[in-house]
């Protein structure tokens, strides 16, 4: 493993530890409890893990491991009713018939995560990839590569 890749993996591991130790569920009963946290990494051709399972108050964070590529986590618009909050900002916004995340780059220090807990169930989503790592730069509405994955909320 190159030094650059080792440094990136170390940073991701440290960020994951900080996020999982600092995230709380908020709200009334059980306020202050640590939310179960899952990290999903993606690159040009793979999502790891493709299926992630979290408890009802859990959360997911996405990390882009593909240099020079922008990724967008994309949910169908009908997922909005499954969220425990009405506003999916700042991480997701509605665009047509989908909710699309902020762009996720390999160099971006901000993370994209679920804005609030999802109801129990299984939710498919896509990761749209664009950028020079896949060829020419293109618009977010025209992904050059689409990866598919799933979240299972227990």
Regions found by a protein language model. Name each.
Residues 22-25:
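Bacterial signal peptide processing site
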Residues 67, 77-79, 130-132:
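Solvent-exposed coil/turn segments that connect beta secondary-structure elements
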Residues 30-61:
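N-terminal edge beta-strand
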Residues 50-75, 110-117:
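Beta-strand cores of secreted/periplasmic/IMS beta-sandwich domains, seen most often
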Residues 79-90:
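Short aromatic-acidic-glycine turn motif
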Residues 17-20:
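C-terminal motif of bacterial Sec signal peptides marking the signal peptidase cleavage site
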Residues 1-11:
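Bacterial N-terminal signal peptides that target proteins for export
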């Amino acid at each position: 493993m190159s030094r650059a890749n080792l440094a990136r993996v170390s940073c991701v591991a440290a960020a994951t530890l900080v996020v999982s130790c600092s995230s709380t569920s908020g709200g009334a009963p059980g306020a202050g409890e640590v939310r179960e946290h899952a990290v999903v990494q993606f690159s040009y051709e793979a999502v790891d893990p493709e299926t992630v399972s979290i408890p009802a108050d859990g959360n997911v964070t996405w990390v882009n491991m593909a240099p020079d590529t922008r990724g967008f986590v994309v949910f169908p618009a009908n997922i909005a009713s499954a969220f425990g909050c009405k506003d999916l900002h700042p991480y997701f916004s509605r665009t047509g018939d989908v909710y699309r995340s902020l762009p996720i780059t390999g160099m971006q220090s901000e993370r994209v995560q679920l804005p609030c807990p999802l109801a129990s169930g299984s939710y498919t989503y896509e990761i749209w990839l664009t950028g020079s790592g896949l060829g020419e730069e293109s618009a977010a509405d025209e992904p050059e590569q689409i990866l598919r994955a799933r979240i299972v909320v227990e």
